[in-house]
Design a protein with these regions (language model features):
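Flexible, surface-exposed loop regions and adjacent strand-edge segments
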Residues: 61-65, 97-103, 153-158, 197-206
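Cleavable N-terminal export/targeting peptides
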Residues: 1-38
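A short acidic/glycine-rich loop-to-helix N-cap element
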Residues: 57-60, 155, 212-213
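Transmembrane beta-barrel strands of outer-membrane/channel proteins
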Residues: 44-50, 83-89, 137-145, 170, ...
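Predominantly the C-terminal beta-signal and adjacent terminal strand-loop region
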Residues: 175-232
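Short glycine/proline- and aromatic-enriched beta-strand/turn motifs that initiate or cap beta-hairpins
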Residues: 24-77, 87, 148, 208, ...
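Gram-negative (and chloroplast) outer-membrane scaffold detector with strong preference
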Residues: 71-155, 159-162, 174, 221-232
Length: 232
C-alpha cells in the first residue's frame, strides 16, 4: 500500500512539473511579452489627409482635395466609437447645359466640403497592442455639407449628402498616452443632377445627359489620413 502511495505521489509530482514547464514555454513574462494593455480613456485625434475619387459621369461632383480635422474616440474593450469633424478643400467643374459640347465644361473651381461622421471600430488585437501596433476595421455614417460653389447656370449644387464609409487602419503607440495612426476609407455619397442636364442645348441640340439616364448617381471616394492622438 505504501509503495502504491509513493508511486502515485511521484507520478503526480511529475505531471505538475511537466505542466509548469509547458506553461513556461507557451506564456511570456510580462516584461518580455509582445502584448501590452492600451491605456483607457478618451482619445483626441488631429488628422490630415487627401480625399479623391469619382466626380460622377457628368464630372461636376467635388473631389481631389486635402483634408484636416479632429476626431474623438472612446474605447469599449475591443470595440471603439468615434465622432469626427473634417474640413475638405476640394474642387469641382461646372457644366453649362446651354452651351455646346466643346465649351460647356469649365474649371476646376474650389468647392469646400465639411464632413461630420460617427463610427465604430473593431480592434483586432482586443484591448492590447502587439509590439505597439493595433490594427482595426470599421465603418462610419455621416453627412457631407457643401460650401460655397462657383456660379452654375444649370442650378446644380452639391448640397448636403448622406455618407457611408467602410474603413481599415493601424494605430501605433510609441508611448502610453501618445498614438499615431493611419486610416483608409472609401466614402460613398449620391449626386443629384438638375433636370436641365437632360435638355438639348440650343447650339448642337446635345443634352448633358441622355433622356433615359438617371438624375442620381452614387460616387465613391478613397480617403487616406494620418493622425496623432492623445489619450486623456
Amino acid at each position: 500500500m505504501r509503495t502504491a502511495v509513493r508511486a502515485a505521489a511521484l507520478v503526480w509530482l511529475g505531471v505538475v512539473a511537466s505542466w509548469n514547464g509547458a506553461s513556461a514555454q507557451v506564456g511570456h513574462e510580462p516584461a518580455h511579452s509582445p502584448y501590452h494593455d492600451v491605456r483607457r480613456g478618451g482619445v483626441l485625434v488631429f488628422t490630415f489627409g487627401y480625399l479623391g475619387g469619382s466626380r460622377g459621369s457628368v464630372g461636376v461632383g467635388p473631389s481631389e482635395g486635402k483634408t484636416g480635422g479632429i476626431r474623438y474616440e472612446v474605447p469599449f474593450g475591443a470595440v471603439g466609437a468615434s465622432l469626427g469633424l473634417v474640413y475638405a478643400r476640394m474642387n469641382r467643374f461646372v457644366v453649362d447645359p446651354f452651351k455646346d459640347t466643346t465649351s460647356r465644361k469649365s474649371g476646376p473651381s474650389t468647392n469646400d466640403v465639411v464632413l461630420l461622421d460617427a463610427g465604430l471600430q473593431l480592434i483586432l488585437t482586443g484591448r492590447k497592442t502587439w509590439r505597439g501596433f493595433a490594427p482595426y476595421v470599421g465603418g462610419v455614417l455621416g453627412v457631407a455639407i457643401g460650401g460655397t460653389s462657383p456660379r452654375d447656370t444649370s442650378g446644380y449644387k452639391f448640397g448636403t449628402k448622406f455618407t457611408f464609409a467602410p474603413n481599415v487602419g493601424l494605430r501605433w503607440y510609441p508611448a502610453r498616452r501618445l498614438s499615431v495612426r493611419g486610416d483608409v476609407r472609401l466614402v460613398l455619397w449620391k449626386l443629384v443632377y438638375p433636370t436641365q442636364f437632360k435638355q438639348p442645348d440650343p447650339i448642337d441640340n446635345t443634352p448633358v445627359l441622355p433622356s433615359t439616364a438617371s438624375l442620381t448617381e452614387w460616387t465613391s471616394h478613397p480617403w487616406a489620413t494620418i493622425g496623432v492622438g492623445w489619450t486623456f
